[in-house]
Amino acid sequence: MNTPIPNQIIREITPLSDKDCFYIAERYKTEFTYPIHNHSEFELNFTEKAAGVRRVVGDSSEVIGDYDLVLITGKDLEHVWEQNECRSKEIREITIQFSSDLFFKSFINKNQFDSIRRMLDKAQKGLCFPMSAILKIYPMLDTLASEKQGFYAVIKFMTILYELSLFEEEARTLSSSSFAKIDVHSDSRRVQKVQEDINLHYQEEIR
């Protein structure tokens, strides 16, 4: 008799280097396969043409539309994007991961960063931005994915965070806590995926 597979949350080791301000990955895919996971880095995740995908953040579970933008700063907050009923073969995903050290205390506590500080704090439970915010930052996000490196890329990324912080009151908190542990459903794409395969492909598929 086989022992039931326990609920597992992968602790992801991200590609973010200590010498980089952020790590950005742009992918075009036909499906989401990476299992439920968490990591110590902050994450901003954008999806396009992914209507029908189920987004799980902590104890929040929602089916998303064509566009979705979420910020997660909870270091133990598990999350996953599940294929669910999505039929699109042209999914675009842009993931930006960055360390909390990017904003050292003497910097983030300045008055000019009030809105960013509040947003990062609120995002410990996951923060979903409205379409108006997505439209505001889309041109910058679109070009940042191709730039990736250099001083001006960092400035553009910080500008994106600032612009999003102006939508803090409109953005929705997702999870009821920053450390909610949900039950893992019997989704074969997640539960039966072996650790060796995860380690082999994690740089191509962050989720």
Regions from the language model: what does each represent?
Residues L16-K19, H39, I64, S88-E90, ...:
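A generic fold-level signal
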Residues E48, F98-S100, S146:
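Short beta-strand-to-loop capping motifs
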Residues E43-L44, K136, M140, E163:
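Amphipathic, well-ordered alpha-helical segments in soluble domains
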Residues M1-L71, D76, F113:
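Generic protein-terminus/edge-of-domain signal
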Residues N2-L16, D76-M140, E169-A171:
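A hydrophobic/aromatic-rich effector-binding and dimerization subdomain
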